[in-house]
Amino acid sequence: MAKQSMKAREVVRVKLAEKYRAKREELKAIISGVNSSDEDRWDAVLKLQTLPRDSSPSRQRNRCRQTGRPHAFLRKFGLSRIKVREAAMRGEIPGLKKASW
């Protein structure tokens, strides 16, 4: 199990990313825009740097919904490999069965 503080930190990152999403997209459009002047680009870069660090979506980490484990995360299920295996063995995931050959 992950520490509660790590799970809470991840929740804060998700909220911040959603809060600043529109502003971040607007600034990035100015930076990558062909018609923007160099001064506008520089101002946009400086404004982007003033945004909170955790508002960037790349700082978010996929975590298991049950345990908070950050590694071996399977996006399709939202769980770690360990919890997917446990659920599959109990037959809780429709259409998923253990391979045998």
Curated annotation (Swiss-Prot):
Transmembrane segments: none annotated. One of its GO terms (molecular function) is rRNA binding. It holds the Pfam family Ribosomal_S14. It comes from the Bacteria. PROSITE patterns: RIBOSOMAL_S14. One of its GO terms (cellular component) is small ribosomal subunit. One of its GO terms (biological process) is translation. InterPro entries: Ribosomal_uS14, Ribosomal_uS14_bac/plastid, Ribosomal_uS14_CS. Binds 16S rRNA, required for the assembly of 30S particles and may also be responsible for determining the conformation of the 16S rRNA at the A site. Belongs to the universal ribosomal protein uS14 family. NCBIfam families: PRK08881.1 (NF006477). This is Small ribosomal subunit protein uS14. It comes from Pectobacterium atrosepticum (strain SCRI 1043 / ATCC BAA-672).
